Every structure is written in C-alpha cells, then in structure tokens.
Amino acid sequence: QLGPQDLPYLTADLSKKQGPWLEEEEAYGWMDF
C-alpha cells in the first residue's frame, strides 16, 4: 500500500505525463493499491 512518503514520487511521475488524462490519473492512479 502507498503511504504519505510515496506522494512526492507520484506527483513527480504525474508531472512528467502532462496530458488530458492527468486529472484522472491523479484521482484513480494513486488509489490502485
């Protein structure tokens, strides 16, 4: 499972994937435990 320490990495990963799907990834991608 993901913890608060994983959020900076995930945020950086999302910022590399700037696109129309970014918001959906933010909402659902990080919840994929």
UniProtKB/Swiss-Prot annotation:
Q: Which superkingdom, per the lineage?
A: Eukaryota
Q: Which UniProt keywords apply?
A: Amidation, Cleavage on pair of basic residues, Hormone, Pyrrolidone carboxylic acid, Secreted, Sulfation
Statement: the UniProt record of this protein carries the keyword GTP-binding: no
The PTM Sulfotyrosine maps to: 28
* GO biological process terms held by the UniProt record: G protein-coupled receptor signaling pathway; response to food
Localization in the cell? Secreted
Which GO terms fall under molecular function for this chain's record? hormone activity
* Sites of Phenylalanine amide modification: 33
Annotated positions of the Pyrrolidone carboxylic acid modification: 1, 18
Any Gene Ontology CC annotation: extracellular space
Cross-referenced PANTHER family, in alphabetical order? GASTRIN
Protein family per UniProt: Belongs to the gastrin/cholecystokinin family.
Biological role: Gastrin stimulates the stomach mucosa to produce and secrete hydrochloric acid and the pancreas to secrete its digestive enzymes. It also stimulates smooth muscle contraction and increases blood circulation and water secretion in the stomach and intestine.
> Mind telling me what this protein is named?
Gastrin
Origin species: Didelphis virginiana (North American opossum)
Q: What gene does the UniProt entry assign to this protein?
A: GAST
